[in-house]
Amino acid sequence: MVGPFAARWRAGALAIVIVPVVVAVTRALVRGWGPIGDNGILVVRADDVLTRHHPLLGSWTSASIASGQAVHNPGPLYFDMIAAPVKLFGHSVGLALGVALVNVAAVVFAVLVAERVAGRTSMVAMAAAVVVVEWSVGSELLFDVWQPNALMLPGIAFMVATWAIAAGRLSFLPWVIGIGSLLVQTHLSYVYLVPLATISAIAIAVAGNRGANATMPWRRPLAGAAVVALFAWAQPLFEQFTSSGQGNITSLLDASNQDSQRLG
């Protein structure tokens, strides 16, 4: 049972990280905000979810320049996550609400995990750090679907989840795989960070347990992580093996090799 005093602290910490996003979205929509440029293309792809144009991949990536063929970010998870608000409320309101909901979920997750891993002081510190980020980037970035901006707060959630694993909380492994998959699929800039952070967190957890007599409970977290990974990557894998031409994963590897050869 959580006492009323602890509950008030938690409610306050959650409120201060949620309010900036809510205020930013509300103010923008009242002023008639709408997606333009790349954001307009991204919202159309979100609206395509569960239609005959359903996206199996992410958006076009500049890796296409190196490979000489159309290459996309690895997967459509972000489109899937914001599709419902876009379809229900339209391209302007729905897009802003969809991105805002993802960001709210990310910051709430970060704050609650910090409390679970290290207590109230950690929760308050995490909330303060998130608020600093939210206020420093500017209000419009808090509901911007352009990938480098849209993944900023989910990226924080991912790092908090890896910290939890490093602290021995293996039950967060499925969360790391799920959020990490979202990051990698949405923008290639995370393709090295996510595996490196995940492996490092697991290594730290194993090293920290060497002196303990109890065996770490790996079975259930690994099983959960495998299920999450299969679900998260089902669409890109389907595209890879059913594409009439070269699959996107192969194209990404080719583009990476060509970039390496040019740099060499």
Residue ranges of model-derived segments:
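Membrane-interface alpha helices of multi-pass inner-membrane proteins
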Residues: 159, 173-200, 228
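Short hydrophobic/aromatic helix or loop-helix immediately within or flanking a transmembrane segment
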Residues: 41-49, 63-91
